[in-house]
């Protein structure tokens, strides 16, 4: 239990540390914003498909009944 306050203080110090890149930026670096946009678009599409499949009217992968 003596280590717990020290652990909390270290967590607070880590969270309040200024953000910086450990590596210097080179010409090869790709900005992450297009990758994040693609990820958001993919997740949004998957969620729309899942909602659609729950309704059962547009899901092409729905199991066939009567087998």
Swiss-Prot record:
Entry PTM: O-glycan consists of the disaccharide Gal-GalNAc.
Keywords per UniProt: Bromination, Calcium channel impairing toxin, Disulfide bond, Gamma-carboxyglutamic acid, Glycoprotein, Hydroxylation, Ion channel impairing toxin, Neurotoxin, Presynaptic neurotoxin, Secreted, Signal, Toxin
Propeptide: 20-50, 64-67
Glycosylation sites: 60
Claim: Signal is one of the keywords in the record: yes
The keyword DNA repair appears for this protein: no
Subcellular location: Secreted
Expression sites by tissue: Expressed by the venom duct.
Modified residues (4-hydroxyproline): 63
Family: Belongs to the conotoxin T superfamily.
Name of this chain's protein: Epsilon-conotoxin TxVA
